């Protein structure tokens, strides 16, 4: 699993970096020729794309390193740090767009030949849609937080390019403030995406529990297993591609230790079949030592 995960995530990061670099060159020429503030917004966003995707590429490779003596749980948290760094990059570009857009609203500047800008934006839109489609497939296969953050970033680019097309079309017909208005709206959306991305990264760094649906699946697996009378203290978190799952099983007092170990091992294998690559720790408790109120699951 780790080899497949590493290959897919690395390819997604390389594809994003290459795409952003190519689009940056095209947008520089288009902005120089047209003077459009919307294209300038897209140009700045491409600079941020390159910085973010390069950060992703380096961090993902680091996060895939195996656990060592100093990092016994692995290096998966590096993905969350990459997502947090991306949110900072994106917030900076959004603030730049705010300032540039307000300046052009106050003093609008007609652009040269909007047709060139429209052509460039159509190319950028098509390329970005292709990239997002590939990233979505990688996220579905790997659940990588770093690639998901990158995908959210490029999804905002799709919306941005669509808005730029409308703005350039309106400017072509003489409404020059449309360019700045749409750039301002794009900046607001980008800032919202950045804040959401940063929130998710911080939650991961704080060891937020797995989603309710996944925890419920773990509960269903454990409670349906023969020989398990109950369970409690389910604790979960995720670091990179690895889920960490801890749970206490309640078993009959007179169950031999060997049999208790066998049941716990079978439960562990069942959880691993559902969540491959997880780190599962199971503790066995005699029913008599578990308080009555502890017989139910406590989702921690």
Swiss-Prot record:
Keywords of the record: Cell inner membrane, Cell membrane, Ion transport, Iron, Iron transport, Membrane, Metal-binding, Transmembrane, Transmembrane helix, Transport, Zinc, Zinc transport
Pfam entry (one): Cation_efflux
GO CC terms in record: plasma membrane
Molecular function per GO: cadmium ion transmembrane transporter activity; ferrous iron transmembrane transporter activity; metal ion binding; zinc efflux antiporter activity
Topology with respect to the bilayer: Multi-pass membrane protein
Subcellular location: Cell inner membrane
List of residues binding Zn(2+): 45, 49, 153, 157
Keyword Transmembrane attached: yes
The reaction(s) this protein catalyses: Zn(2+)(in) + H(+)(out) = Zn(2+)(out) + H(+)(in); Cd(2+)(in) + H(+)(out) = Cd(2+)(out) + H(+)(in); Fe(2+)(in) + H(+)(out) = Fe(2+)(out) + H(+)(in)
Keyword Nuclease: no
Span of the signal peptide: none
Principal location class: membrane
Record-level GO BP terms: intracellular zinc ion homeostasis
Transmembrane segments: 24-44, 82-102, 114-134, 156-176, 178-198
Subunit structure comment from the entry: Homodimer.
Function: Divalent metal cation transporter which exports Zn(2+), Cd(2+) and possibly Fe(2+). May be involved in zinc and iron detoxification by efflux.
Similarity comment: Belongs to the cation diffusion facilitator (CDF) transporter (TC 2.A.4) family. FieF subfamily.
Record's protein name: Cation-efflux pump FieF
